[in-house]
Amino acid sequence: MNLRITETAFELHLRKVYPTRNILSMRETETIAGQECLDVQKKTDGSVNIIGEVATDPVASWMIQSAQVASKFTLFTHHAKTFPDLVTALRNSMLRAGVFKDEKTAEEQVVQVLNFDIHLQKDFRGRRYIERVTECIPVVDQKTYDHDYKSEKTMDGKVEKFFQNATT
């Protein structure tokens, strides 16, 4: 697989780890924006996009873009403590970067590109290990909440309608 890497600072050094792989590494400079790097990578034959560290709003935007159109899959690092924190942080980055104006749409886009969260931790010797793997399954909201319970005359009727609504 061909690797396409975008970093804000060269720190992955994957050519040392995978010397026989076809690797294209790019980073933002004073004259070349990170978005331009990503646009070039979209035009290359890359199977895997790796975003060095998603620590700023623009970099989060690049990650979402590359995951949607640029490769078979995208890997990235982030320092969120939990999976819900990761979704919230990426959603907020999309909003602050101006990519989306609506929280719901931004969160849906984030959740669509996150398949798994592989959370690493360090042991007391400083070695990393996989603490947990969380699968992200988008919830498809097919039913809207109705207010039929309001027209019921009795409390039992209201409760029955309310729970029917909540469980279907």
Where are these regions (language model features)?
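NTP-binding/hydrolysis catalytic cores, primarily Walker-type P-loop NTPases
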Residues: 125-168
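Switch/coupling sub-region of P-loop NTPases
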Residues: 1-109, 121-122
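Well-ordered beta-strand positions
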Residues: 116-118
